[in-house]
């Protein structure tokens, strides 16, 4: 099988005639399941990216979020709290035995979260298929996101098992070293993998990993993503979990992968690493900037909403458009 592959930095979208007077007229709203959200983005469900207070802020302000699964006991109180406040509840599960019992416990307590994400590194597996079916049996109203995957076969199989959306991306993230440790993954061709998977999908796809700029969010939408999961761009904020250190008068915050020893607390099956990211200030400011950039993109696409982006032409430029200049 030969597949023409490319990644984010290899692609440029081609503008269409602008039909709005101001980019502020452009609507970045996206629908996922029964809810509409302000933007097609979701912070990665990683310990150094999302925490309860960030989740509450996002839910209150109309953004999608997925709470991480690394504090299992906190999930039921969290769902109760979100439901009490009438905000969306969105959590993650793994596939181990205790997670099966956890799903049954949610059902027993009559606590159906709005969204559950089954979150494992290699999502094309029987354990994920069984977990999808278990959630659909016990919590039929819950929207199930399953991943991560990197092939059309995987997307079809998880959709057929009952997944309402699939998450595409194996190891393209900044703190993911799966591609180095195992030789497998979508690192270096994530955008082409997304396109390949989206062509097979009948349900929404969440692009996960490899997003380095706001323009990459737009490229993901062009190639079939409904939602775009973002780690490193959301790391390093005032509100982020994780340690802060000062070096030569500059503040940095830690950011580590979900399969790193820092998250696991042990050196076993390590496929993530830790990096220090320069402190970025307030998360609110980053969200505002992202929103404005998305509005600009819609105006370049010649439309008024995200749909316009899906139809634009593109070119594949096999040289990096940034020439190594980080924004």
Swiss-Prot record:
Its EC number is 1.7.1.7. It comes from the Bacteria. Keywords: NADP, Oxidoreductase. GO terms for cellular component: GMP reductase complex. SUPFAM superfamilies: Inosine monophosphate dehydrogenase (IMPDH). It holds the Pfam family IMPDH. GO terms for molecular function: GMP reductase activity. The active site is at residue 176. NADP(+) binds at residues 205-228. CDD domains: IMPDH (cd00381). InterPro entries: Aldolase_TIM, GMP_reductase, GuaC_type_2, IMP_DH/GMP_Rdtase_CS, IMP_DH_GMPRt. GO terms for biological process: purine nucleotide metabolic process. It catalyses: IMP + NH4(+) + NADP(+) = GMP + NADPH + 2 H(+). PANTHER family: GMP REDUCTASE (PTHR43170:SF5). HAMAP family: GMP_reduct_type2 (MF_01511). Catalyzes the irreversible NADPH-dependent deamination of GMP to IMP. It functions in the conversion of nucleobase, nucleoside and nucleotide derivatives of G to A nucleotides, and in maintaining the intracellular balance of A and G nucleotides. Belongs to the IMPDH/GMPR family. GuaC type 2 subfamily. This is GMP reductase. It comes from Helicobacter pylori (strain ATCC 700392 / 26695).
């Amino acid at each position: 099988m030969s597949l023409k592959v490319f990644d984010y930095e290899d692609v440029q979208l081609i503008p269409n005639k602008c039909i709005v007077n101001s980019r502020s007229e452009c609507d970045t709203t996206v629908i996922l399941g029964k809810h509409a959200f302000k933007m097609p983005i979701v912070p990665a469900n990683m310990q150094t990216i999302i925490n309860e207070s960030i989740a509450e802020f996002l839910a209150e302000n109309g953004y999608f979020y997925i709470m991480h699964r690394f504090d299992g006991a906190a999930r039921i109180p969290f769902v109760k709290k979100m439901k009490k406040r009438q905000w969306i509840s969105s959590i993650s599960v793994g596939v181990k035995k205790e997670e099966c019992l956890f799903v049954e416990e949610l059902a027993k307590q009559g606590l159906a979260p709005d969204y559950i994400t089954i979150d494992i590194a290699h999502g094309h597996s029987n354990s994920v298929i069984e977990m999808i079916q278990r959630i659909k049996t016990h919590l039929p109203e819950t929207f199930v996101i399953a991943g991560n995957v990197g092939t059309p076969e995987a997307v079809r199989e998880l959709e057929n098992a009952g997944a309402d959306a699939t998450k595409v991306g194996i190891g393209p993230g900044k703190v993911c070293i799966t591609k180095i440790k195992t030789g497998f993954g979508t690192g270096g061709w994530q955008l082409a993998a997304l396109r390949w998977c989206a062509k097979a999908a009948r349900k929404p796809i969440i692009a996960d990993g490899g997003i380095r700029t706001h323009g990459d969010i737009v490229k993901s939408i062009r190639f079939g993503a409904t939602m775009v999961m973002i780690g490193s761009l959301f790391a390093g904020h005032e509100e982020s979990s994780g340690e802060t250190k000062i070096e030569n008068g500059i503040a940095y915050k830690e950011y580590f992968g979900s399969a790193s020893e820092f998250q696991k607390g042990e050196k076993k099956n390590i496929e993530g690493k830790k990096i220090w990211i320069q402190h970025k200030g307030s998360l609110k400011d980053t969200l505002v900037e992202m929103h404005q950039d998305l509005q600009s993109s819609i105006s370049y696409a010649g439309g008024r909403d995200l749909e316009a982006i899906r139809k634009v032409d593109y070119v594949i430029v096999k040289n990096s458009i940034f020439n190594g200049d980080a924004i």
